[in-house]
Swiss-Prot record:
NCBIfam families: L21. This is Large ribosomal subunit protein bL21. Pfam families: Ribosomal_L21p (PF00829). GO terms for biological process: translation. It comes from Staphylococcus saprophyticus subsp. saprophyticus (strain ATCC 15305 / DSM 20229 / NCIMB 8711 / NCTC 7292 / S-41). One of its GO terms (molecular function) is structural constituent of ribosome. InterPro entries: bL21-like (IPR028909), bL21-like_sf (IPR036164), Ribosomal_bL21 (IPR001787).
Length: 102
C-alpha cells in the first residue's frame, strides 16, 4: 500500500517503513506527526481524493531535524566591479513512515 501526501508545497509518494526528507516541520525529534492531506491511496483498493481522501491519514515518526548541503549563489554585474556571494542551507526533517490509514 502506498499514498501520496502533500507537505511543504510538494507531493510525496510514501510507503510504510520508508524514510523520507521533507521541508522543515516544527516538531521535536522522536515525536509522531500525522499528515491529513492525503491526495491518493493505492494498493488493493484505490482511493482518489478530490482534492483529499476523506478520513485518510499518514502517521510518521521524526528521526532528525537537519540542514541540507550548502549551495553557493554568486551574482555579478559585468564591467561594474559589483559582485555578491551568498550561501544557503535548506532546513529539512527526516521522517520514517509508520502507518497509512485509509
Amino acid at each position: 500500500m502506498f499514498a501520496i501526501i502533500e507537505t511543504g508545497g510538494k507531493q510525496v509518494k510514501v510507503e510504510e517503513g520508508q524514510e523520507i526528507f521533507v521541508e522543515k516541520l516544527d516538531v521535536n525529534e522522536g515525536d509522531s506527526f500525522t499528515f491529513d492531506k492525503v491526495l491518493f491511496v493505492g494498493g488493493d483498493a484505490v482511493k482518489v481524493g478530490a482534492p483529499t481522501v476523506e478520513g485518510a491519514s499518514v502517521t510518521a515518526t521524526v528521526q532528525k531535524q537537519g540542514r541540507g548541503k550548502k549551495i553557493t549563489v554568486f551574482t555579478y554585474k559585468r564591467r561594474k566591479d559589483s559582485k555578491r556571494k551568498k550561501g544557503h542551507r535548506q532546513p529539512y526533517t527526516k521522517l520514517t513512515i509508520d502507518k497509512i490509514n485509509a
